[in-house]
Amino acid sequence: MIALLTGKLAYKSPEFIILDVNGVGYQVHIPFSTYYTLPVEGGALSLQIHTSVKEDAINLYGFRTQQEKELFQLLIGVSGVGPKLATGILSNSEPSELADSLVNGNLARLSAIPGIGKKTAERLVLELKEKMKKLGLAQPQAGGTTAPAKQEIRDDVLSALINLGYKEAVVQKALAELKVTEDATVELVLKQALKILMK
């Protein structure tokens, strides 16, 4: 069971990265909370890993901190929440914000996340409220990144949000409200788009 990987960041996208560990490339799925903190491609990187084993596949999920990993594992421990949905939940809320929503029973905020209905939100609060109080969560730190072209940024954000469960037309509308500046990054535009979508 893989629990930690350390190597060189060979490729990154909002959905997954490829981590080069001594010449072997590992594809690791990540939430936005981890993506925001990644170094530039070629940089050194160490990720906490959760290994998901199924009959037909072995998937790796990576996190910059042990706390994020623990939160992910708490989420998938809730009935009806698999690794993909748990990653989506973390992608829509920073760990500290998610913890606050669970502790305070903010069902409206939780239900606004794609893939989570009212019943799932209620189940999350019921099962995780007390556990969240015991789990200290730090704000993710911003990581360095280069500034790609505006259209490339929009395309990456569009793809990432569609993969999270948002309708393309809804995402396009949100992106239309944003002004992508010359120094904009995928991380920044993702955060801004999510704020609009979560209204």
Curated annotation (Swiss-Prot):
<keyword id="KW-0233">DNA recombination</keyword>
<dbReference type="InterPro" id="IPR010994">
    <property type="entry name" value="RuvA_2-like"/>
</dbReference>
<keyword id="KW-0227">DNA damage</keyword>
<dbReference type="InterPro" id="IPR011114">
    <property type="entry name" value="RuvA_C"/>
</dbReference>
<dbReference type="GO" id="GO:0009379">
    <property type="term" value="C:Holliday junction helicase complex"/>
</dbReference>
<dbReference type="GO" id="GO:0005737">
    <property type="term" value="C:cytoplasm"/>
</dbReference>
<keyword id="KW-0238">DNA-binding</keyword>
<comment type="function">
    <text>The RuvA-RuvB-RuvC complex processes Holliday junction (HJ) DNA during genetic recombination and DNA repair, while the RuvA-RuvB complex plays an important role in the rescue of blocked DNA replication forks via replication fork reversal (RFR). RuvA specifically binds to HJ cruciform DNA, conferring on it an open structure. The RuvB hexamer acts as an ATP-dependent pump, pulling dsDNA into and through the RuvAB complex. HJ branch migration allows RuvC to scan DNA until it finds its consensus sequence, where it cleaves and resolves the cruciform DNA.</text>
</comment>
<dbReference type="GO" id="GO:0005524">
    <property type="term" value="F:ATP binding"/>
</dbReference>
<dbReference type="Pfam" id="PF14520">
    <property type="entry name" value="HHH_5"/>
</dbReference>
<dbReference type="InterPro" id="IPR012340">
    <property type="entry name" value="NA-bd_OB-fold"/>
</dbReference>
<dbReference type="Pfam" id="PF01330">
    <property type="entry name" value="RuvA_N"/>
</dbReference>
<dbReference type="InterPro" id="IPR003583">
    <property type="entry name" value="Hlx-hairpin-Hlx_DNA-bd_motif"/>
</dbReference>
<keyword id="KW-0963">Cytoplasm</keyword>
<keyword id="KW-0234">DNA repair</keyword>
<dbReference type="GO" id="GO:0009378">
    <property type="term" value="F:four-way junction helicase activity"/>
</dbReference>
<dbReference type="InterPro" id="IPR000085">
    <property type="entry name" value="RuvA"/>
</dbReference>
<dbReference type="GO" id="GO:0000400">
    <property type="term" value="F:four-way junction DNA binding"/>
</dbReference>
<feature type="region of interest" description="Flexible linker">
    <location>
        <begin position="144"/>
        <end position="148"/>
    </location>
</feature>
<dbReference type="InterPro" id="IPR013849">
    <property type="entry name" value="DNA_helicase_Holl-junc_RuvA_I"/>
</dbReference>
<dbReference type="InterPro" id="IPR036267">
    <property type="entry name" value="RuvA_C_sf"/>
</dbReference>
<feature type="region of interest" description="Domain I">
    <location>
        <begin position="1"/>
        <end position="64"/>
    </location>
</feature>
<comment type="similarity">
    <text>Belongs to the RuvA family.</text>
</comment>
<dbReference type="GO" id="GO:0048476">
    <property type="term" value="C:Holliday junction resolvase complex"/>
</dbReference>
<feature type="region of interest" description="Domain III">
    <location>
        <begin position="149"/>
        <end position="199"/>
    </location>
</feature>
<dbReference type="GO" id="GO:0006310">
    <property type="term" value="P:DNA recombination"/>
</dbReference>
<comment type="subunit">
    <text>Homotetramer. Forms an RuvA(8)-RuvB(12)-Holliday junction (HJ) complex. HJ DNA is sandwiched between 2 RuvA tetramers; dsDNA enters through RuvA and exits via RuvB. An RuvB hexamer assembles on each DNA strand where it exits the tetramer. Each RuvB hexamer is contacted by two RuvA subunits (via domain III) on 2 adjacent RuvB subunits; this complex drives branch migration. In the full resolvosome a probable DNA-RuvA(4)-RuvB(12)-RuvC(2) complex forms which resolves the HJ.</text>
</comment>
<feature type="region of interest" description="Domain II">
    <location>
        <begin position="65"/>
        <end position="143"/>
    </location>
</feature>
<dbReference type="GO" id="GO:0006281">
    <property type="term" value="P:DNA repair"/>
</dbReference>
<protein>
    <recommendedName>
        <fullName>Holliday junction branch migration complex subunit RuvA</fullName>
    </recommendedName>
</protein>
<dbReference type="Pfam" id="PF07499">
    <property type="entry name" value="RuvA_C"/>
</dbReference>
